[in-house]
Amino acid sequence: MSKSTKKFNSLCIDLSRDLSLEVYQSIASVATGSSDPHSDDFTAIAYLRDELLTKHPNLGDGNDEATRRSLAIAKLLEANDRCGQINRDGFLHDATASWDPDVLQTSIRSLIGNLLSGYSSQLFRHCTFSNGASMGHKLQDAAPYKKFAEQATVTPRALKAAVLVKDQCSPWIRHSHVFPESYTFRLVGGNGVFTVPKNNKIDRAACKEPDMNMYLQKGVGGFIRRRLKTVGIDLNDQTINQRLAQQGSRDGSLATIDLSSASDSISDRLVWSFLPPELYSYLDMIRSHYGYVNGKMIRWELFSTMGNGFTFELESMIFWAIVRATQIHFRNTGTIGIYGDDIICPTEIAPRVLEALSFYGFKPNLRKTFTSGSFRESCGAHYFRGVDVKPFYIKKPITDLFSLMLILNRIRGWGVVNGIADPRLYEVWEKLSRLVPRYLFGGTDLQADYYVVSPPILKGIYSKMNGRREYAEARTTGFKLARIARWRKHFSDKHDSGRYIAWFHTGGEITDSMKSAGVRVMRTSEWLQPVPVFPQECGPASSPQ
């Protein structure tokens, strides 16, 4: 056995302790200024310090898992109650507002009506299943081909549409003849509430939809997504909003607006008021009217929750229409950007947009809304005076090499200016990097967790012409940790038929992979490209290699 093989076989993936607090303390020791983006004393490193552990499950000023879950559900139910009040009493207009709600609503209806014209022939074209958990399938069994192959769930109101769309797919019909149990649908009362981690104080609530409801909802979502692109709102590209946020932080021309529980604040009355009647009726038919919360069924006053297949596109369209109608009303022609509930509009009309949003039942999050100053935030991008100050987060304990290498790369990639990493973070990077085997250094991808990005080891190209090595086409050389994935190669006849139906919908190879706990060391070779360098590394014999 070679020395190299022995070295790899003896590699210990796990660390002896969680290093998260050590990273935090090192950053806190060099942080100065205020972490409040609204403050004149704001500094990026103080912002990083206070954000670093906000998503860690055990550290920081957080709550336990049960409390986070209960707070998330309580927040969802509170939003549902607000929607119920709007459904009963209507929208509450502030008499001091500088616009007429009837005029604004007429403009909004016109914008949405024109955007969605000809919808009746488009809604079934892009229906498909997601790979998420549903009321009929747990997450580990939620591959789309399994939903096609097995008996699907549906609400009573959506049953007619589900039968109609299934009968238009010939592979699905043939499958049902061979496997009769998949021909009929299983009726369920509604969706089911679950929570996912958001930060260490509160979880995020969402819902698992019945299978066929989700299938139909995604058809609507895909249609709205394509139509929004015709007016400059591309829901497949977050970088548009990110660039606009950078522009706003640089010259103050654009404001970024954040809403609290945005999608859960879309009331039934709001959708009824904005959408064409026939389209509203169809969306109302395929949504879940009831939900299971902690084993009890409740009625949804909000129109759709996160987890519904059209919620993201519907809220994007609604916010686009509100902002655009406000622009028209006040004769503003500036740039707008919408990505879900990430709203960007010209600074001069931002107060009017906030008024309109509040009128329709939305709650602006003023802590994360920026209409003045030099800070802007949108779609995960954070800019101060045009410079990227996005913090990184420790979302789980740093207890193995993968999590350690990821945080080392985050440290190197934070606060980079002209290719130079922040020198204040070098000490913690250098100290923790000693725990990683040296053959895992030399990578170039700062988003990776399978090697450490560092000034690369060069591999020269031998030239037969002059008999020496040249570095004109240098590549990095080293190793990386690779997770072992096992691919399912054999499928039952039923699931193989489901794979064909899934292929008929989306094309491409339909596979099913499972991750195992095993890892192995693999050689890596990447084209040399610039990586951020700490000033302390810019001297003779200073490279960690």
UniProtKB/Swiss-Prot annotation:
It is an enzyme of class 2 (transferase). It comes from the Viruses. Residues 243-373 form the RdRp catalytic domain. One of its GO terms (biological process) is viral RNA genome replication. Pfam families: RNA_replicase_B. Keywords: Nucleotide-binding, Nucleotidyltransferase, RNA-directed RNA polymerase, Transferase, Viral RNA replication. Part of the viral RNA-dependent RNA polymerase complex, the other subunits are probably the host ribosomal protein S1, EF-Tu and EF-Ts. This is the catalytic subunit of the viral RNA-dependent RNA polymerase complex. This complex is involved in viral RNA replication that produces (+)-stranded genomes via a complementary, (-)-stranded intermediate. This is RNA-directed RNA polymerase beta chain. It comes from Enterobacteria phage fr.
